[in-house]
Amino acid sequence: EGLVSKQRDGAYPAGRTRAWIKSKCSDRQEFVIAGYVPSSVSKDLVGSLVLGYHEGGKLVYAGRVGTGFSRTVAHDLVARLEPLRRKTPPFAEKPTADAARGVVWVKPELVAEVEFRAWTADGILRHAAFRGLREDKPAREISREAPAAAARPAKPAVRLTHPDRVYWPDV
């Protein structure tokens, strides 16, 4: 889920200190916007976006993103999505009733950049946050990205030592 690091000269006290930092790892990817759910505060604001990606020429449901947009952005998104309204979901497989509840479906023409923590076993985004629209990418080119192959580990930059001996002198 992330990394915990400490300042090099930081102590090891019990409890939390500023010398220790927790950093969460996340992915970032573009998704096609297939619909939206109006905000519970105002129907003129987006509450969440319904996302998908192309696979084998078909649009696949990837989940929703309901955080990361300001009130202004949420209002602007409704203005951009309203002209694209359609009656049916654009996905190859019909979403479940729960996934489709309250959704205003749109033509899959806009692309959102989304930051997220992981994919579930069912292929749904976890802990997604909207980061903006991508005007430079056509929706038809958006597919699920595969992680790059892991690089070979670098040689350690820090020598591990003990006051009385050196560990792994060849490293």
Regions found by a protein language model. Give the residues of each.
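Catalytic cores of nucleic-acid ligases and guanylyltransferases
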Residues: 1-171
